[in-house]
Amino acid sequence: MDAMKYNDLRDFLTLLEQQGELKRITLPVDPHLEITEIADRTLRAGGPALLFENPKGYSMPVLCNLFGTPKRVAMGMGQEDVSTLREVGKLLAFLKEPEPPKGFRDLFDKLPQFKQVLNMPTKRLRGAPCQQKIVSGDDVDLNRIPIMTCWPEDAAPLITWGLTVTRGPHKERQNLGIYRQQLIGKNKLIMRWLSHRGGALDYQEWCAAHPGERFPVSVALGADPATILGAVTPVPDTLSEYAFAGLLRGTKTEVVKCISNDLEVPASAEIVLEGYIDPGEMAPEGPYGDHTGYYNEVDNFPVFTVTHITQREDAIYHSTYTGRPPDEPAVLGVALNEVFVPILQKQFPEIVDFYLPPEGCSYRLAVVTIKKQYAGHAKRVMMGVWSFLRQFMYTKFVIVCDDDVNARDWNDVIWAITTRMDPARDTVLVENTPIDYLDFASPVSGLGSKMGLDATNKWPGETQREWGRPIKKDPDVVAHIDAIWDELAIFNNGKSA
């Protein structure tokens, strides 16, 4: 897996600009609603990343729509295009369940993968670009950062692309997670992490081990693309996000110890927020427009107090918006879909394709095609999708079809559902399962049901009826009509519609 090399975000932006994938906006634009409107129109048109050089009221530029096309996601992962992301998935599948070499020849075949693993440890620096400027104490003022307000009814400006760094009291490895953070004061943010996410689990363990003590937290903004994407990729639990970023980049991830705590942050990050969460300090978060296309409920979450802001000279603020698909998370979902396929295929070799339609909010509906081998096979695959990767814990609907169906073509999928399913026999309902807290359709917050649809051809044991045979054209007739098609001139110019 030959990687394209980027040392930091600025390196990546230079390459994007050279390829016409970055547009600098010099006209003054307001971070309050206006940047979202421009970024949304640009993303829907498949346009470039946007660097707003003169956000109204601020001296710091805003970067938006960085991963607004699958191509730029692939480039951020060090690949030339989306098709090569399957190689990233194969590497992750190998790392999730590595197989020892079966012999001398197999050792040489696996050597490239083992070489990549050697790049995994981080490299700690004594000084780093992210600490070129430091403010602390009363000088900390988050209002100097052009934090966007994305939608008219949003409660306040919202940090969206922060990489939150935490470590549990009994863990050697840090956790990187992306959690939105509402601005509520010059040095205060609300940390919206759900109870099952890595950062929240680290916090819960800390509170149990150190009752009443402050929990150290750091947030990196504008890290290099490999590190950013490492935080949203299905990395095996035994592998750190920094290590995975090193694999993508082909070089060890450079980190630096924070000024005020022992956490390590990306050395090249544009901005780092350092601080703590005081157990018991909570605040109501929201409402905010989110990736479902709705405003979510207000709920209480911990307050993150920022004690230090470190940053690069001429720092860039990296941001995004979330709304009804397509948005940037939906585009990331389309690209990362290619990463998921080899991981699932390693566990379930019968899977031919796996697709998360972006209009299904990136993860709420999955279509799987399989080479069916026995009665009940589709139901086994449904259960596997829900349980194998935690990324699909919140997938509400799983549709399983045969391999003669194109998982990415709704015409095919709907045809299979309507012709191969009996609703009572082929629908699986599972109650009281984990559901996204943002899913207001569930009867209880965080707990709801799932539906599996078996749209495969039915085998003996699944039906007593004679099963229909799909209509197929005679290939000889098709070839003959192809040969005389132009002579027919049905469409005047002789070309088929």
Curated annotation (Swiss-Prot):
Q: Which residues form the active site?
A: 290
* Membrane-protein topology: Peripheral membrane protein
The subunit field of the Swiss-Prot or TrEMBL record says: Homohexamer.
A single Gene Ontology MF term assigned here is: 3-octaprenyl-4-hydroxybenzoate carboxy-lyase activity
EC class of the enzyme, as a word = lyase
- For this entry, the protein name equals 3-octaprenyl-4-hydroxybenzoate carboxy-lyase
Q: Which reaction does it catalyse?
A: a 4-hydroxy-3-(all-trans-polyprenyl)benzoate + H(+) = a 2-(all-trans-polyprenyl)phenol + CO2
